[in-house]
C-alpha cells in the first residue's frame, strides 16, 4: 500500500496490490475522526447491500503515558458496538475497527505490535491483504504512544480522522496547530484513502453530521485532565455534542486495560463497560462508569469524612434494618457515638453491599459511599 501523507483538505493517493480475503470478515463500520474535506467532495449516502452490517461509528483510541493505560471509547448507531469495535491488551496497544469492521485488525494488529511493530507498521501490514480495505476504518495506538488512523474511500460521509502529533511536526504542512487556553494543540488531520500517523491518540468517525464530531473528540481529549477513562468519556460526550452519527445513537462502550488491573488482578480489564442498546447510550455509559468506580476504585483522600454524630444518626436506622449491620451487637452503644462496635457493624454492612474497596478502619467514611447508601435507602 502506498499512502501519501495528507494535507488538510486534499485527498491522498492510495494504491493497492495483491490481497486475499480476511480470515474473520466482520460486518461493522469502524468510525474514524472526521477530516475537513468539503461535503461536496465526498460520496453521497447511498446504502449498499451490506449497509445494515456497518457500524456507523465514532471512536477514539488512546495511550496514557503517566499510567501506561490504553483504552477505547466508542458510540454507534449499531447494537453491541462494544463486542466488535474495541480491542486492547495492556503493555501492547489498543485498536478500534469500524465501518464494515474486520476483527483481524484487532487480533492480528495487537499480535504484530506485541512482536515489535509500531501502530502504523501493524496497520499497513494488515492493509496489504485486505480485499475490502476501502470499506474499513481503523484507529490504532501502541504502548509506546505511536498512533495511526485509516479511513477507506468507500466509507460514508462524513468520514475521516485525527491523531495527535505530540511534538514538533516533521512535515509541517500535514499538521494543524492551534493555541488553546491550556496550551498548544497539535493534530494530524486526514480524510478518505489516507493513513495518518501521530502520537497519543487516534480519533475516527464515519456517517457523521460533519467533521465537528472528530474535531471535538480530538480537542476534548487533549484538554481534559484526569485519568484515561475520564478523558475518553469526556471526548465521547463532546463528539456527540458535535453532531454525532447521522442516523442517531444506539450502543456505546468504554474499554481501558492496565496490567493486573482487572478483578483481583487476574487480568488486564481495568474498565470494560458496554451498553448494548439504549436511547442515550453515552449517558448510560457514564452512569455505569460511575457505578464501576464506586465498587472497584479505592477512595480518594479528598472524599474521606470523619464519622460525626450526625453521620451516625443518619446511618443508625439503616443499620438497624439490615441483617449485615448486626444491630444486636451495638444497640446498647452510646447514642451518636462512632465507637468500635458501631464501626464494626458499618464495615460488615459495607462488605454486604459490595463497597469492599472503600471500607475504612480509621473512623472515616467515603463521602460517595455515604451518599450512595442514603440515596438507596431513601427510595
Task: Identify the meaning behind each predicted range.
Residues 1-22:
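N-terminal secretory signal peptides that target proteins for export/translocation
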Residues 261-279, 283-287:
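Long, contiguous interaction/recruitment modules in multidomain scaffold/adaptor proteins
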Residues 15, 23-25, 166, 187:
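Secreted/luminal cysteine- and crosslink-motif detector
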Residues 248-251, 265:
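C-terminal substrate-recognition/cap domain of FAD-linked oxidoreductases
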Residues 9-11, 34, 40, 358:
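Intrinsically disordered and other compositionally biased segments
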Residues 42-247, 254-256, 277-303, 330, ...:
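Alpha/propeptide regions of enzymes that mature by internal proteolysis
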